[in-house]
Design a protein with these regions (language model features):
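PLD/PLD-like phosphodiesterase catalytic module centered on the HKD motif
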Residues: 1-146
């Protein structure tokens, strides 16, 4: 998609800032694949877990809801997304999303970061790192079963 559409970006929690140990492990395992899609990936470092689910298309379509864009949300959970055709709402949502970008660093495919807002990364504590690696190595393969 990012080859055909300009200005496609994704905001997610950094590994150190992620309050979801399974999400953190999944991102750790798949980060290179995600970055190699050509998406502009921003890692939120706000000190509490980012849980937003919003999409902006052009300057008039806004998509807001609880859908996690994963198989669990498709088949198990009761999730929804609201699609709104409104330039005013799109502009307001864009401003809100940009405010999160100011507390994030842009991850690059080479492993480095662009940090235009001089954001201090959230440290991955030794406990959380061990927990994430345990999940990555022994539990993550089961994520498709739930």
């Amino acid at each position: 998609m990012s080859d055909k559409v300009e200005n496609v970006s994704l905001m997610t929690n950094s590994i150190g800032n992620n309050g979801n140990p399974f999400g953190s492990a999944d991102y750790y395992v798949n980060k290179d694949k995600i970055l190699n899609t050509g998406l502009e990936v921003w890692e939120y470092e706000g000190g509490y877990s980012y849980h937003g689910k919003s999409i902006l298309i052009d300057d008039n379509i806004s998509v807001i809801g609880s859908f996690n864009v994963d198989m669990r949300s498709v088949y198990l959970d009761t999730e929804l997304m609201l699609v709104i055709d409104s330039r005013e709402i799109n502009s307001q949502l864009n401003e809100a999303m940009e405010s999160y970008e100011h507390i994030a660093r842009k991850a690059d495919a080479d492993g480095s970061y662009d940090n235009p807002y001089d954001v201090e990364p959230v440290e991955l504590t030794p406990y959380r790192e061990k927990r994430m690696k345990l999940i990555k190595n022994f539990i993550l393969w089961t994520r498709y079963l739930f």
